[in-house]
């Protein structure tokens, strides 16, 4: 067989399409399919080295009197939002939650769920969110897979939680 050289028809400064330039693994965290919607600048921009709690607080220090969200007539300012996050973070710490702990939250996206996510991020814990409509077996599998030690659950999910909690490493359940 004769040796040969392959020449590309693309100019040397042209980059290949990100979608076609690598093999698809099937893992979103590796394949990053969302990048196809990003500009090159946005896709390669370095992320800030801070928690999303700190990022949100730093980027809204001049917006403290503006509304952060409205939910069924309930409005709150950034100042009150960050105060609620701080109180929730202190409460989690008082319960024994510490940096690196995984806290599962089985609740829809209520304002309280958002506050809990930010509070856990503030203290360095990891929020693992589960849809409360998930069946008991899947909740059990998820709790065991991530080795969650704490569980916050919507009260209507308690019957499901109660049926599986002894099969997990969860040491504290809080129903709201």
Regions found by a protein language model. Give the residues of each.
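Conserved ATP-dependent adenylate/AMP-binding module captured primarily in the ANL superfamily
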Residues: 132-168
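Flexible, non-catalytic linker and terminal segments flanking ANL/adenylate-forming cores
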Residues: 1-49
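AMP-dependent adenylate-forming
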Residues: 29-36, 53-77
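Short beta-strand elements of ligand-binding domains
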Residues: 107, 130-131, 171-176
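Structured binding elements
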Residues: 124
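Short acidic/polar active-site loop segments enriched in Thr and Asp
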Residues: 98, 149, 171
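Conserved AMP-binding/adenylate-forming core of the ANL superfamily
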Residues: 46, 65-110, 114-118, 135-140, ...
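Structural motif
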Residues: 104, 150-154, 174
């Amino acid at each position: 067989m004769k040796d040969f050289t392959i020449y590309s028809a693309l100019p040397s400064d042209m980059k290949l399409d990100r979608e076609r330039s690598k093999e698809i693994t099937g893992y979103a965290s590796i394949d990053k399919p969302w990048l196809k919607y990003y500009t090159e600048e946005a896709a390669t921009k370095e992320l800030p080295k801070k928690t999303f709690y700190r990022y949100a607080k730093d980027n809204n220090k001049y917006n403290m009197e503006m509304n952060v969200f409205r939910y069924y007539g309930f409005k709150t300012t950034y100042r009150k939002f960050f105060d609620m996050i701080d109180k929730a973070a202190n409460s989690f710490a008082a319960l024994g939650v510490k940096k690196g702990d995984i806290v599962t939250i089985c609740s829809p996206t209520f304002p309280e769920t958002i506050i809990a996510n930010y509070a856990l991020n503030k203290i360095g814990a990891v929020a693992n969110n589960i849809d409360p409509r998930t069946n008991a077996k899947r909740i059990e599998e998820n709790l065991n897979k991530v080795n969650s030690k704490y569980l916050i659950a919507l009260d209507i999910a308690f019957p499901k939680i109660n049926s599986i909690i002894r099969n997990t490493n969860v040491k504290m359940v809080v129903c709201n």
